[in-house]
A protein has these predicted regions:
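Short, charged, intrinsically disordered terminal tails
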Residues: 5-10, 98-109
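Amphipathic alpha-helical interaction surfaces in cytosolic regulatory modules
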Residues: 31-105
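STAS-typified acidic loop motif
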Residues: 3-42
């Protein structure tokens, strides 16, 4: 694998879809950190601006998230009633639990 391929695998991305009820499902993949969180925020902001009652973050493809990623999730939580984290890795689960955010960022079993 060359350096470019490796970089493409780690760059974070966000894809916005909607469930049958019209609520946003945001698929995060790669790494979410301070180097890309502003671009990811800009990509998901139109869905959040619609003030949905709930947002699901599908985290199955997420390989890394630092505190700026948690801050992004909290910003979304402030704009909605419910934020659910689907397929969160053990690392993300530990971060959410250790910071006492399980009431704000709900982890799906």
């Amino acid at each position: 694998m060359d350096e470019l391929d490796e970089q493409q695998e780690t760059v974070g991305s966000a894809e916005v879809g909607y469930d049958p009820a019209g609520l946003p499902v945001i698929r995060l993949s790669g790494e979410v950190d301070m180097s890309n969180v502003d671009a990811l925020r800009a990509k998901i902001q139109p869905a959040i601006d619609k003030a949905p009652a709930s947002v699901v973050f599908d985290m199955a493809g997420l390989t890394f998230m630092d505190s700026s990623g948690i801050a992004l999730l909290l910003q979304v939580a402030a704009a909605t009633k419910t934020v659910q984290l689907r397929d969160a890795s053990p690392l993300v689960r530990r971060i959410v639990e250790a910071t006492g955010l399980t009431d704000v960022l709900r982890i799906e079993a």
